[in-house]
């Protein structure tokens, strides 16, 4: 029987660099994760591509997906919906492949309830002032929205106790290395490895 894949969930406050870290991880040739693309109702940022960075939907389309139980998790964050398509995630895990989710904190907590065996990593900013600077530098939010995001960020940072690991994103390359090391260690845990060896001993 094929070993079930590992669900890797990366989340953290807006502006912490989740997308940048995810892109850096998937640009490396030795990356073996499958990326689960999220669905959102927010407008695309400059350079974002539909079906690559997100599936961009209208609110009506998103709410229909909720009604049809097509989302593993979903949340409304600063006026926009975000969610994860459930079918792709479950099938990929059954195929023995690791699935990488980059989602908002609210969504991650929902996934934790559905997949307690998953690996949950909180990406943290070096400081709140640096986090605000990153959001401002994006140039995509109004002053009011920036303040809303900062309030949300403070609340989200307080939720990091719900995660297995915390990685500070002070340097993208270093953060990527830490995340990949965490995933490797998780695959080598006794709970995942021992059953395979015990079965091998039974055969011999």
Curated annotation (Swiss-Prot):
One of its GO terms (cellular component) is cytosol. Its EC number is 2.7.4.8. ATP binds at residues 12-19. This is Guanylate kinase. It comes from Bacillus subtilis (strain 168). Belongs to the guanylate kinase family. It holds the Pfam family Guanylate_kin. CDD domains: GMPK. Its main location: cytoplasm. Residues 5-184 form the Guanylate kinase-like domain. It is found in: Cytoplasm. InterPro entries: GK/Ca_channel_bsu (IPR008145), Guanylate_kin-like_dom (IPR008144), Guanylate_kinase (IPR017665), Guanylate_kinase_CS (IPR020590), P-loop_NTPase (IPR027417). Essential for recycling GMP and indirectly, cGMP. One of its GO terms (molecular function) is ATP binding. The keyword Lyase does not apply. NCBIfam families: guanyl_kin (TIGR03263). It catalyses: GMP + ATP = GDP + ADP.
């Amino acid at each position: 029987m094929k070993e079930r894949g590992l669900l890797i969930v990366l989340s953290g406050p807006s502006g912490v660099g989740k997308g940048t870290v995810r892109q850096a991880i998937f640009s490396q040739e030795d990356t073996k994760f499958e990326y689960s693309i999220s669905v959102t109702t927010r407008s695309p940022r400059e350079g974002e591509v539909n079906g690559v960075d997100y599936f961009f939907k209208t609110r009506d389309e998103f709410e229909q997906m909720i009604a049809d139980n097509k989302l593993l998790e979903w949340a409304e964050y600063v006026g926009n919906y975000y969610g994860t398509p459930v079918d792709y995630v479950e099938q990929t895990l059954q195929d023995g492949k690791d699935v990488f989710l980059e989602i908002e904190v609210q969504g991650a907590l929902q996934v934790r309830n559905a997949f307690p065996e998953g690996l949950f990593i909180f990406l943290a900013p070096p400081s709140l002032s640096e986090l605000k600077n990153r959001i401002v530098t994006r140039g995509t939010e109004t002053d009011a929205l920036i303040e809303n995001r900062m309030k949300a960020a403070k609340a989200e940072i307080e939720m990091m106790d719900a995660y297995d690991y915390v990685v500070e994103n002070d340097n993208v390359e270093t953060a990527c290395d830490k995340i990949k090391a965490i995933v490797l260690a998780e695959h080598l845990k006794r709970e995942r490895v021992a059953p395979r060896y015990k079965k091998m001993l039974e055969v011999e």
